[in-house]
């Protein structure tokens, strides 16, 4: 099984970390993935480089398997991050567009209602990235943060994005690219050390965070993710939980029915997280302050109906 790292030459925040990683020892040229995607190999890691949008080049894992006969175990995408604040940041996040209805067009890849399998490395690598960024002097200039689940491309294997933000000045920062390269080098065990964040289901029932609610940067979920030995699945921000206020809805299937695609989002996020962490204890954590009373009640009742356990911060130990 191989790890697929995907970079695009169209984005300096993508190709620079890939180039820094490829400058480290042990890489050899690999096959060309049709039509023109270069690849490089080191142990069980493959880096591929294309020149198109990072969020719209679908099914690269399946295309690699078909072209090479190798089985892809996981996919890691390198990308730029944008933010209204323009604040420099290094981010990690799962992907999917769970809240969209059939027929809606995702603006940044993926497909409506879809959640990628979240990489098991998200939590451990987030903590490792924070330590590395601090050790290399990027903090406090750069914020080290998780992001909520969003955008494509479509994948079929466990996936995560590593991003550098938030403006062109920072996308091109070589020190940020170097830290991202070191994260991959050490996290994948390419330097000979033990890899970080590989899930082993036989090691007992460990706790996996399923974040529900809050803003895009999920600060209350992030406080839990910073705890040692906590694993991270999907993180659903408020915009991924569209809920129709029953007092504003004229026609509803029942008096207490809350419309919107929020149920679809929660169910898809839970199922994908459960699939990535076989044997794990999936615990939903609600950002209570981000919900109105009727929203919290509806979500809590739905989680109980679906037999999804809910945890408070102190339950994640």
From Swiss-Prot:
Predominant subcellular localization, coarse grouping: nucleus
In terms of InterPro entries, this protein maps to: Deacylase_DtdA_archaea (IPR018033), DtdA (IPR007508)
Query: Which Gene3D superfamilies does its entry note?
Result: AF0625-like
Q: What induces it?
A: Not induced by abscisic acid, paraquat, 1-aminocyclopropane-1-carboxylate, ethanol, salt, sorbitol, cold, heat or low oxygen stresses.
Q: What Pfam families does the record tag this protein with? A: tRNA_deacylase
Tissue expression pattern: Ubiquitous.
Span of the signal peptide: none
Q: Which cofactor does it need?
A: Zn(2+)
Its EC number is: 3.1.1.96
Q: Entry cofactor note text?
A: Binds 2 Zn(2+) ions per subunit.
Q: Does the keyword Repeat apply?
A: no
Entry's Gene Ontology BP terms? D-amino acid catabolic process
In UniProt terms, what function does this protein have? Answer: Hydrolyzes D-aminoacyl-tRNA into D-amino acid and free tRNA. Broad specificity toward the amino acid, but strict specificity toward the D-isomer. Seems to be required for ethanol tolerance.
Q: Which family does it belong to?
A: Belongs to the DtdA deacylase family.
The protein here is known as D-aminoacyl-tRNA deacylase
* Gene from which this protein is expressed: GEK1
